[in-house]
Amino acid sequence: MRFFSIAALASAAAASQCGLRKLENLVTFGDSYTDESRLGYFINNNGSAPPPGLRLGESNSTASGGYAWGRFVAKSTGANYNNYAVSGATCSNKIISRDFAAIRQPFPSVLDYEIPAYKADTAFEALYPSRRANNTVYALWIGTNDLGYGAFLTDSQAPGTTISTYVDCVWEVFDNIYETGGRHFVLLNLAPLEQSPLYAATRVGGFGDSQFWPNKTAYNTTEYQYKMLEYTTNVNTMFDYGAPFHLVVKKRWPGASFSIFDVHRLLRDVHAEPSKYLSSPANVTGVYRTCDPVTRACVDSSESKASFLWYDELHPSERADEIVAQHFVDVVHGNSTYGTTYAS
């Protein structure tokens, strides 16, 4: 009976949108898959964070090679957009911490920096002129740096922490958002990193040594591709079961709605049928920008960026982000086969 109840709640949530009247405000958290300019601010200001109340402007110079997915959502819906994502971020530096010389400190993480920055900004009406429970959606996309090279994939996590610790951190992020009055949550699950040129085995066209994994060829790349597949699918399964469990069974966020956006399946569908999504000649195994792992000199493809699934060996392209944004809006409105929404 428990499972039928949860399924019914999911169906009802999709139909009613759980009290979300209109997407007037979008607030995002994450890493380079979402960041527009926040890490750049740290770099350009000697490692200092943006002061509370400062709105960082939009940018089409992101890890996608253009606009990031959140900006596409804001442009298509007219939503007021506040983005706290930082390139290089993990969920918490207490689990995965990676130093970044350009800012003379570890990459700022979601729980340790992004959430406090968001909380500080809520006091500024210029940033949040109309933030209410029924008109604001909070989205999190985090995990690429938690699971990858220099993290769980290479056994670089803090002693005593596990992938379950990372998943628990994700739920804690939403605890903090809930405390500020947030009631509409979207969790974008792990992208198919195992298909990215960075983590794909060299025998199937994956990169060798890379700017993001300098000694990849010292590893059994087939073994590590399958290891990444295991990690992403296991985490996504934990998300699928964890969201309704915490929301409906444990009543962790009373009165909230929680959507799981299956980006993993969406991007695998693009990979399987690229001509449906990408410009010709569609390319889902190569990259638009190739950078030398030693000199960091980069060369761009002569083909259109819109024909590539991957901008570089780790980051989805601007076209991929545009696809993600289109489906994100559908997920929020309960109109996507890539989304499941639960309500408490």
Please report, for each region that a protein language model flagged, where it lies by residue.
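Conserved SGNH/GDSL esterase-like catalytic core that processes O-acyl groups on lipids
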Residues: G53-D168
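Mobile gating loops/cap/lid regions near enzyme active sites that modulate substrate access
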Residues: P192-Y226, F245, R252-H315
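A structural motif corresponding to the C-terminal end of an alpha-helix
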Residues: F72-A79, V173-V186, E223-Y224, E230-I260
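Structural recognition of the beta-strand scaffold that forms the well-ordered cores
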Residues: N25-F29, Y33-S37, N80-A85, T136-W141, ...
